[in-house]
Amino acid sequence: MDESAALLYNSNSIIEDKLDDFEFIKHSAKLKSVIDATRRLNLHKSKHNTIIFVYSAPKVGSTSIVSSLRIFCSNTCDIIHIHDEETLKVLANITDVTVNEIILYNKHLGKNVFVIDVFRSPIERKISIFFEKIGPYHFNNIDSKVNKYDIIPVIHRFNNVFPYIGNDDHFIDKFAIPIPAEFNFKTKYVLVENNGIKYIKLRLMDSKQWHQILTKLLGTPIVIVKDYESLNKPIKDLYINFKKTYKIPINLLETTMQCKHLNYYYSDDERNTYYTTWILKKTDPIITYNADEYKFYQQLCMENSHIDYIQLDHYRDEGCCCKACSIKRNIVATRLLNGLSFDTKICHIEAKTELLVTRAIQVNKINSSISQSVLPRRKQFATEMGKIVAWGK
């Protein structure tokens, strides 16, 4: 029996004992697809009973959470970072399975499953999303050259696409779970348990409390590390200039304040503060792209784009669980728990090289110690006999 067949057999065995199990599990074709997706994500090899899906929209602060969880939980949990089905397609060539099905399947296998999502204030997120692909997508150029562009056409382009980017929220729109009547503004998070899966919703504005929240909910000490900020990228000068220069058209601000996600995750006072902050940066209303114009814009950008843009190296911890990475991860975790910082990444090549260098240094120290040891002096026969003869005289 091959590995896939064994997984299928085990799943079918479970179905017999769970009459109320997830519907898609009972369809063999779909089940095989989900099992294959699990294999492609390497979850079939895991010996951990807990899996954490950081399943969020892009540019909300999720990368920081992923790296933090990898540093502190990799020895007990699997951590999976997914934005959407497109992520599954690009990274693992998974095309016929949804993220929710993968999540449900892991619960079906008896795993302890957490799903974490984050909300970020809408205007800031739109800016971040726009700059994420400003070179290869919006201006069909490399970031280092776009970094030197005049700010006026950049602002004009951003305003035109403003209504169409950064509008999704996975917790409300994609998880298909009951949503509490209001966000818990006291605890700074929402926890919903559905089908035995724990869904956690955080807010980026509360990131300074994330370590306390996640330590409590996950039952292990966690320190949050900063990760992948636009100020560290090739377009940082343009990004800084944009944030300093940008004034929001009043009609875009008014539309933003009507956002259902903003009105759910922010209290009345928080929304008033947010509005007050941006009303000081308002400007005259504009006419943006309409839906058809934006669709044409998307098509044109895709056709013109010739620069591949897939981010694979933007984590402080890339998640490798080899011995070298685990050793470095333990060192980093200890530093963070002691209030110290770290300025390196945990990636396999660097960790392996560092371990080899460390071992070489240790071997050299041992060899040096051995060579410097004072060995017992061999007896000199002639000298000793001379002493004996002298004593006998």
Predicted regions and their residues:
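PAPS-dependent sulfotransferase catalytic domain
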Residues: 2-269, 274-283, 297, 372-373, ...
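Juxtamembrane luminal stem/stalk of type II transmembrane Golgi/ER carbohydrate-processing enzymes
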Residues: 1-50, 296-393
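Generic detection of intrinsically disordered/low-complexity segments and helix-coil linkers/edges
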Residues: 3, 16-18, 152, 233, ...
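A short, terminal or domain-edge coil/loop segment
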Residues: 83-87, 133-142, 289-292, 298-302, ...
